[in-house]
A protein has these predicted regions:
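Electrostatic cytochrome c docking/interface patches
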Residues: 21-44, 121-148, 233, 240-248
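Surface-exposed interaction/gating patches
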Residues: 136-161, 166, 172
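The canonical Cys-X-X-Cys-His
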Residues: 42, 46-56, 112, 116, ...
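Residue-level signal for the nucleotide or nucleotide-sugar donor/cofactor binding architecture
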Residues: 37, 75, 104-107, 140, ...
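Bacterial N-terminal signal peptides that target proteins for export
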Residues: 1-10
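Gly/Gly-Pro-rich "capping" loops immediately C-terminal to redox-active cysteine motifs
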Residues: 32-39, 43, 55, 59-85, ...
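C-terminal motif of bacterial Sec signal peptides marking the signal peptidase cleavage site
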Residues: 16-19
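Axial heme c-ligation environment in periplasmic c-type cytochrome domains
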Residues: 61-68, 86-119, 124-135, 164-169, ...
Length: 248
């Protein structure tokens, strides 16, 4: 009997010692749930707030791809952060900052901004390409924009922007009502590679569309918005630099 008693006592003692550090009913660390404003994990923040429009990996969504080195080479952190925090007026891009009625703290927005660039950007990607500026630097001329459209865009999007064999209509008032001037400019610069649309360099091989021509095309498109649309007063294109793209 004694030979069995001692091993049993040792086992019971060991079990008691193991239980001392975890009182019955006390949840372990794995059961702790962070408050929404305490989450500082990019995958969670991006997945819950951005992936629905921009795609699970920063591409493939309805909005412009964020995991696009061309976009990240022309858009600076301040522009990306501003669009994330304050949204884009008149578009589907909401404000996420608590100060603007959203749910995210400044630190969370800073994290999203920095991680988008560190994960998907390529330092120096367009250093030798002399890309157009992210924002317009001058007023656009709709008449000149129509001519530039005919040169660079009509082959895909058709006469007047009403759709062609390769591209959809971009003069549709329903579309123009949902995208800002800056959004149009960004799409022209970066293209939509996932949809087969080239960036500003490749519409005509060896003849990239110029910064001013982009500004003019945006002015021409903006002039076709319905007057009741939120951007109806932006046809001069002078406020592009104050707006963020529909997808940042």
């Amino acid at each position: 009997m004694n030979t069995l008693r001692y091993p049993v006592l040792m086992i019971l003692s060991f079990m008691l010692l193991c239980g001392c550090g975890s009182p019955h009913g006390k949840p372990g660390k794995e059961a702790e749930i962070l408050a929404p404003d305490q989450i500082m994990d990019f995958a969670i923040l991006y997945g819950e707030n951005c992936a629905g429009c921009h795609g699970a990996e920063g591409r493939g969504g309805a909005a412009i791809a964020l995991a696009d080195p061309v976009y990240l080479a022309v858009a600076d952190d301040a522009s990306i952060r501003n669009a994330t925090a304050n949204g884009v007026r008149g578009t589907a891009m909401p404000a996420f900052a608590q100060s603007a009625g959203g749910m995210l703290t400044d630190k969370q927005i800073d994290l999203i901004t920095s991680q988008i660039r560190s994960r998907w950007g390529r330092p120096g990607f367009l250093n030798s390409a002399n890309p157009p500026s992210y924002s317009a630097k001058s007023a656009g001329n709709p008449a000149q924009g129509a001519l530039a459209y005919n040169t660079y865009c009509e082959s895909c999007h058709g006469p007047g922007g009403h759709g062609g064999a390769k591209g959809s209509s971009i003069a549709d008032p329903a579309f123009l009502a949902l995208v800002s001037d800056q959004g149009l400019r960004t799409i022209i610069i970066t293209g939509r590679p996932e949809l087969g649309a080239p960036d500003w360099r490749a519409n005509i091989p060896g003849k990239p569309i110029s910064d001013q021509e982009i500004t003019d095309v945006v002015a021409w498109l903006a002039s076709q918005r319905a007057q009741s649309a939120p951007h109806a007063n932006s046809t001069s294109n002078t406020t592009q630099h104050q707006e963020s793209t529909n997808a940042r």
